[in-house]
């Protein structure tokens, strides 16, 4: 089944959304679906989603990612077009997958900085998940988009929220500083609400582009994974997100339901959700 993309709405008066779905060719039970919704801000949608199954060197890879941009769309759009290709171009991807992903993240960030004249001063978070032959899941992330696995109905976070407060020591050792004003979140150099990101050339020397990488075996206890931008996690915790979608067998409907719930809870940010069901 080919990946299907559509432009839809979440209902009367709701922002327009991008949605899509697809399924594995080697395991008919493994399916993905995604949904997005623009937030309340006046700027264009800055979340970008990548979701597809791809046959590579006789293996099947499920490639899933959410790129949550800031300042402009150019960096997340570049990541959508290039990050997975850069990962798969690493010569030792199959033998040392975690190291290959780390190198590809750094290479991609270096390239973004080199292309500053074209891509501008913006940046992006990222959470990527690579499903290898429906058996092994490798998750990497920069920033605060999140990956959460449901295992026997219990939420397990497979990413790290890279918040300025928790990485204050590293930021200060690089010559930066963290501000925390009343009514606002902590920010690097008074600007960025995450401590790790792609791009952001103006404050790059105070940020990190080193991803956290986690590996998970997909067995009978692993039910589904949620990838979502921070528009979800600002209004619900991991277990609430799992509980919201666990009874919805259609992955695309599950992603849409999670966004609907976030909107009910007054999330004002751009929201993107991918759900991958394993059985």
Where are these regions (language model features)?
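PP2C/PPM-type serine/threonine phosphatase catalytic domain
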Residues: 1-279
